[in-house]
Amino acid sequence: LKLSAGFVGFDGTENKRTLIAMDAVKKAAGIEGDINVLLRQPHGRAISILGKLSRMCGVKAYVSDEGDKAKWESFGFKIEGGFNDFFEASDFVMIGSPGGQETPYVEAGLANDCYVSLMGGAKRPKIMAELEEKGVEISDELKADFEREFFFGLENYEMFASAKPKVIQCTSCNTTGICRASLAARPLGLKMIMGNIDRRHGDPHTVVKASPSAIDIGKGVGHQGTDAGTVFEEVTYSIRASKAPTTVPHTSFLEFVFEGDVTTEDFVKSLANTREVVVMPYEDTGGRAHEWTSEILEAFLSGFERPISPEVYELIVSDSIIPVKLGDHTIMQVAMMVEQMSIAVPNHVESYLLCAGYPADKVHATVDEALNCVHGTWPDKLSN
């Protein structure tokens, strides 16, 4: 297999993590091809991460604007070519540009017969409308790609492999977390998930102009549950997304509604058996409580060697689940944590393997072993 991968927005919080992960998975899967990055104007963060990616992954750099070539070369980087050269050299393009800026890259990717993978925040209907306004022909097959459910490889890899799409949109960070939890809960008779996501609003790339002790409560349901509903159509989702101006992980407080009698032990066991889900004991065998999100992240991360910190590919779920019996249904109140910059990375990488034609029966094990993604119960009952 050979499939060269290109990254737009290579220095973004998710994309740089995806690039390093893809390099590891490409090698593990025996897939040949270059890893290319498209540069804009040089700035400190981009210069720093390009140096790291060059050392670790041997990336090849291209510039969007020929006027920036000399600037990048002055920092000691070799520039392979320009905007069109980047797309000609790439068979697969991961677009991680800021929201609302994806269309020209999608257009160039399709014009060069690239597979295009979008991150969760992209607005496909808007992108398709903008392409049509620019005179791009939208075939029935391409229209189906823009309207297809979100890609969540643990559930729908085989369906996507049969469809052979040119455009894929991966689940976002919180949607990925909801989908993994849904995958664990479905065998127990899951009917509905409702509740609230406290979305952190203090990421490294975000300047927060808000009270440090105030929360934006949000209006109506967020896209996260709605997007998960395209993957798990039999489940009803009603999830609000608020914003908390902190750097803690996104923290979801959700109610899982099951038909019939379900025990917390059943749910914990199913969560621990689901790929890329880790159950965190509220109280460990030594009697120490794990009740603060910052301490939970520190405790988990300390046991792994990963290229960029923080890097938590796993959904972390506290075992402090509160069961409620309501008639013929059981409701489980659950607290779970999503590290926004890295949880979707395994899914991004699977979108690349999908386009490379990698077999469905090997894909999840290959990704988890290459990235050392674990599932189970922390600290000593974890496996790939």
Predicted segments — roles?
Residues 1-206, 363-367:
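N-terminal Rossmann-like NAD(P) cofactor-binding subdomain of oxidoreductases
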Residues 12-16, 80, 99-103, 176, ...:
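Electropositive phosphate-/nucleotide-binding environments in soluble metabolic enzymes
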Residues 13-75, 196-199, 205-335:
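C-terminal substrate-binding/catalytic lobe of Rossmann-fold NAD(P)-dependent oxidoreductases
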Residues 88, 183, 269, 346, ...:
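A broad, structural surface signal
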Residues 157, 200, 259-261, 338-342, ...:
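Generic structural motif
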Residues 171, 217-218, 338-341:
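Hydrophobic alpha-helical scaffolding
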Residues 184-188, 257, 354:
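Active-site catalytic microenvironments for nucleophilic, acid-base chemistry
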Residues 304-384:
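NAD(P)-dependent Rossmann-like dehydrogenase/reductase catalytic/cofactor-binding core
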